[in-house]
Amino acid sequence: MIVVSMTSWTKRITYVKKVVESIMNNTVQPDRVYLNLSETEFQGIQLPQDLVDYFNSDERLIINWVSGPTTKAMKKIFPILKYLQDDDIIIDADDDILFPKDLIESRLNDFERNGKRYSISSNTHTSVGFNGQMKVVSAMSLFQKKMFNHWQEFVTQAIVDTNNDDRTYLHLIWLNGFLNRGCTKWNIFILLEQYDMKLDNPISKKNSDFKGGLIYDRIAQKEFNRISNKNVIDSFGFWK
């Protein structure tokens, strides 16, 4: 089974329908898409009706309400593990990015090419956000459920307080005896044409209070200059 798992919060929930539509329009469709939402965060807040209607129209789309003291963090993947088998594939997705039509197919090809022995970690890609701006994100990595075994023993409150979710996933993969490989990059200009969007000013996905925020901003600016001035058609990544 191929599962896409994602989360969102109140300031981005209006984007989610478009994100999921871009996922479901892929050349390879997932068997399930889980949207994990915190009961605490959304208490007293009505979800957008178009999002509710869209999820109700397809049994593969599931809103998974999550409760507990740590629901504001680490809820992109962990809440769905109890529904999966060891060899099931999990692809995580950000909630404010439009994805290429062949993204899931590309991740699966990377997984096959590496002998199904590695997680496929996203390169930091140049992607298209909803305001037409370029964003530097690390979106849609591929895992298997067994790569997260013993997560409840590892993800203590101290881990939640001191680590972000992506770093925690990587550490769990290592602890379970797996390694990761970088994914194939996609062509930013094909993505722009697919969604009829223009390249505008680059911004960083990271908040300014994140310790890596400034370097992400510099990377976004550098990549924007590289693409717009030199018309280079490949997208940027930290590793291959």
Where are these regions (language model features)?
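Short beta-strand-to-loop acidic/aromatic patch adjacent to the donor-nucleotide binding site
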Residues: 87-98
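A conserved hydrophobic helix/loop-capping motif in glycosyltransferases and polysaccharide synthases
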Residues: 3-11, 26
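C-terminal catalytic/acceptor-binding lobe
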Residues: 1, 14-19, 152-240
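Residues at the starts of beta-strands that form the adenosine-phosphate
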Residues: 31-32, 89
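Conserved nucleotide-sugar donor-binding
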Residues: 135-154
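Active-site-proximal specificity loops/subdomain of glycosyltransferases
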Residues: 36-88
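Short, acidic, metal-binding catalytic loop of nucleotide-sugar glycosyltransferases
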Residues: 20-31, 39-40, 54
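Conserved donor-nucleotide/metal-binding helix-loop-beta segment in metal-dependent transferases, i.e.
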Residues: 101-125
